[in-house]
């Protein structure tokens, strides 16, 4: 473990130079209420000013993709050998970018553990207004660091897409572009109450299996990271009673708040009239039980003058990592974060992968959505 070597690090932070990157682990970001979140910063070894790709969420920034979703990673790698190629895969993390494929292109990748999750203390309150504020603060923190060019982009799947809508509506100064990849926006309709009927299974199973399992304070009772050998949900270890006191029970909250007009839901809805940032909204035809409505609604209802819609098929996570998805993301962010004249402004506003029999997808370009 290397010692800290940056002014923004503290006694819990450390830095490594390996695999062509400088990695600053457990860097503190202080929130306006005093809570200190922890992030990992993957950046080029050479000092410079770079565009920033950021995510904030509850799945544990130290937790390797393979440590909890091995079957998904193996299947994706077998179907698309390009995904595990040209990278050691040491830093693969569920539903966020692989820094080994972004840092060489002169980006800084910042992963933040959300309040109460992973390495960040506090109380978990899933998709709350407080969490959206935290993300906005993190964006503006990243925008003024010595390695930043002042332009921050948000990019990630599912949870890491959903809170992009909320953050964009808060309009942090340094937010330059977003790419919500398969991300719901209306948690009442898209997740908890389909057609007004409570969805008992998902909210309970998902929150317990994917969020509370890596809650901050599980410490030595949780996962040990293969990335750096430290505890995913450390450094402290709390009792089950203490852990319970440090989270709002998402399932019980969903059950108790039965109407979409309840403050619990309205406080989690983005104000579309304030979502003005350039966006690439990427949906999946096959995820109708959760995410795609958010991507379509976000594209249609936001007031951004620079917005694109892309729709694809197959699994929920796969195309985010394939050459197809990476090409879209990198061209989009290069244009808006780095100022590259790469022709993105001529990209069709709507790009659809239309499904045909035999698992065949045919690309189709359109000028608007809904189609006319």
Regions inferred by a protein language model and the residue ranges of each:
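Accessory cap/linker subdomain of secreted extracellular hydrolases
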Residues: 62-66, 70-88, 92-99, 104, ...
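Short beta-strand element of the alpha/beta-hydrolase
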Residues: 49-58
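Conserved alpha/beta-hydrolase
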Residues: 99, 103-119
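Alpha/beta-hydrolase active-site loop
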Residues: 93-94, 104, 126-146
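A short loop-to-beta-strand scaffold at the N-terminal edge of the catalytic core in hydrolase folds
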Residues: 33-43, 52
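Alpha/beta-hydrolase-fold serine-hydrolase catalytic core, especially in secreted/extracellular enzymes
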Residues: 2-25, 30-35, 173, 249-263, ...
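Alpha/beta-hydrolase fold nucleophile elbow
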Residues: 146-159
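Alpha/beta-hydrolase active-site loop signature
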Residues: 60, 114-118, 184-185
């Amino acid at each position: 473990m290397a010692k800290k070597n940056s002014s923004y690090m503290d006694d819990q932070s450390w830095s490594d130079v390996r695999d062509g990157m400088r990695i600053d682990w457990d860097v503190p970001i202080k929130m306006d209420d005093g809570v200190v979140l922890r992030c990992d910063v993957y950046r080029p070894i050479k000092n410079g000013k770079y565009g920033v790709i950021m995510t904030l969420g509850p799945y544990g920034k130290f937790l390797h993709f393979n440590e909890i979703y091995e079957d998904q990673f193996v299947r994706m790698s077998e179907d698309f050998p390009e995904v595990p190629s040209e990278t050691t895969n040491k830093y693969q993390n569920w539903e966020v970018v692989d820094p080994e494929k972004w840092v060489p292109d002169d980006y800084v990748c910042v992963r933040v553990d959300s309040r109460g999750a992973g390495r960040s203390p506090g109380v978990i309150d899933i998709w709350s207004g407080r969490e959206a504020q935290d993300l906005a603060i993190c964006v503006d923190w990243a925008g003024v660091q010595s390695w930043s060019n002042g332009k921050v982009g948000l990019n990630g799947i599912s949870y890491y897409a959903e809170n992009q809508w909320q953050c964009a509506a808060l309009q942090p100064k340094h937010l330059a572009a977003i790419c919500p990849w398969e991300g719901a926006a209306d948690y009442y309709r898209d997740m908890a109450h389909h057609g007004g009927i409570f969805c008992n299974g998902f909210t309970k199973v998902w929150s317990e299996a994917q969020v509370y399992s890596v809650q901050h304070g599980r410490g030595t009772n949780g996962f040990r990271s293969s990335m750096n050998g430290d505890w995913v949900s450390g450094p402290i270890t709390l009792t089950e009673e203490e852990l319970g006191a440090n989270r709002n029970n998402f399932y019980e909250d969903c059950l108790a708040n039965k109407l979409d007009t309840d403050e619990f839901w309205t406080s989690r809805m983005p104000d579309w009239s304030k979502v003005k940032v350039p966006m690439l909204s990427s949906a999946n035809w096959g995820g109708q039980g959760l995410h795609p409505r958010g991507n379509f609604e976000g594209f249609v209802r936001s007031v951004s003058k620079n917005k694109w819609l892309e729709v694809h098929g197959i699994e929920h996570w796969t195309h985010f990592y394939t050459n197809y998805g990476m090409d879209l993301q990198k061209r989009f962010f290069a244009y808006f974060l780095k100022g590259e004249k790469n022709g993105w402004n001529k990209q069709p506003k709507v790009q659809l992968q239309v499904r045909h029999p035999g698992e065949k997808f045919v690309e189709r370009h359109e000028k608007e959505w809904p189609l006319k």
